[in-house]
Amino acid sequence: MTYLSQIEALLFVAGEEGLSLRHLASMLSLTPTALQQQLEKLSQKYEKDQHSSLCLIETANTYRLVTKEGFAELLRAYAKTPMNQSLSRASLEVLSIVAYKQPITRIEIDDIRGVNSSGALSKLLAFDLIREAGKKDVVGRPHLYATTDYFLDYMGINHLDELIEVSAVEPADEEIALFRTQD
């Protein structure tokens, strides 16, 4: 693995919150100067690559992967996709986690799912099923997410306490079989 690929992977997983220079340097065991050189290489790679939609930005010593400006119109159109499209499995997973664990941060959602949830969160925000509900009082002050009144309408319920209790949902026999161990 190259430093560039490791930086790219870390920034991808960090999503919109990005990572500080100090945190990246620590993760990669690089000096800040050596890391800045690698970040510059990555930035130049994205600038030169016309087949990539990504670019690297830095704000207040925090680095993020974002889409290039030329994709703004396409992404705006995507964000306005009508709600009659079904939600992806990832979006449904994230929506369920937010509904049952709210208020919750993206990192906490990622920890539960084991994968990055930025895309699903963005889609759910665009569909007004979830909202930002403040910031958690921890280092980095990450956004907290909660469901909206539209979520209640969408689910056909009046209050969150009408959600099915998680313990009431029984896994299918096939799912149980996956977790059985053979002695």
Swiss-Prot record:
Protein localization: Cytoplasm
Primary location recorded for the protein, binned into one broad class: cytoplasm
InterPro entries: ScpB_csome_segregation (IPR005234), WH-like_DNA-bd_sf (IPR036388), WH_DNA-bd_sf (IPR036390)
Organism domain of life: Bacteria
Pfam families per UniProt: SMC_ScpB
GO biological process, one term: cell division
Keywords, ordered alphabetically: Cell cycle, Cell division, Chromosome partition, Cytoplasm
Function: Participates in chromosomal partition during cell division. May act via the formation of a condensin-like complex containing Smc and ScpA that pull DNA away from mid-cell into both cell halves.
Record text on subunit structure and interactions: Homodimer. Homodimerization may be required to stabilize the binding of ScpA to the Smc head domains. Component of a cohesin-like complex composed of ScpA, ScpB and the Smc homodimer, in which ScpA and ScpB bind to the head domain of Smc. The presence of the three proteins is required for the association of the complex with DNA.
Annotated family: Belongs to the ScpB family.
PANTHER family linked: SEGREGATION AND CONDENSATION PROTEIN B
Protein name: Segregation and condensation protein B
Lineage: Bacteria, Bacillati, Bacillota, Bacilli, Lactobacillales
